[in-house]
Amino acid sequence: MMPRRDVLFLSLLLVIATVSAVALADDEADCVYTFFLRTGSTFKAGTDSIISARVYDKYGDYIGIRNLEAWGGLMGPGYNYYERGNLDIFSGKAPCLPSPVCSLNLTSDGSGDHHGWYVNYVEVTTAGVHAKCSYQSFDVEQWLASDTSPYELSAVRNNCPVSLRESVGRVGSEIRKTLSWIV
């Protein structure tokens, strides 16, 4: 009878260990990312397009947000985002990056009646439990438009201490496998 009890006890321990490991894996540390976007005051600087963002750390790991407004628009119901002279604020949770945000890819989908958008700057803050808070400012000063110079719907700003090209080749990044686009 004793060996059967040992097998039952070991089986119970195995089940408890498995459940605990799964529970801990699902409890991945999240950070709160807040984006401050300033639209230029130039005539027709505002847009009705959907704006997405990717922020990278120095290793090339990233989080991506397909639609900033849907993900975490904080300006209230009925507010018209990305209008001339506005400072728009977006905030939401996503997995913490291994190091502070240092690069930005800001993209317009070019949709809507007024697709051109002039961006002054973007500021990104990050805060999380047991994670170091960080702040990064990106001077954009560029049109995101297909009919105005530089004729691009994306703006990339890299303030990283090392080249992202060198870092993207880093092997073994679990974050790159689990993150990609959030919304």
From Swiss-Prot:
Keyword Endoplasmic reticulum annotated: yes
A Pfam family reported for this protein in Swiss-Prot or TrEMBL: PLAT
InterPro entries documented for this protein: PLAT/LH2_dom, PLAT/LH2_dom_sf
Signal sequence range: 1-25
Domain PLAT: 31-158
Phenotype of null mutants: No visible phenotype under normal growth conditions.
TM region positions: none
Induction data: Down-regulated by salt stress.
Keywords: Endoplasmic reticulum, Signal, Stress response
Domain of life: Eukaryota
Gene Ontology cellular-component annotations: endoplasmic reticulum; secretory vesicle; thylakoid; vacuole
Intracellular or extracellular location(s): Endoplasmic reticulum
Function: Involved in response to abiotic stress.
Protein name: PLAT domain-containing protein 2
Organism name: Arabidopsis thaliana (Mouse-ear cress)
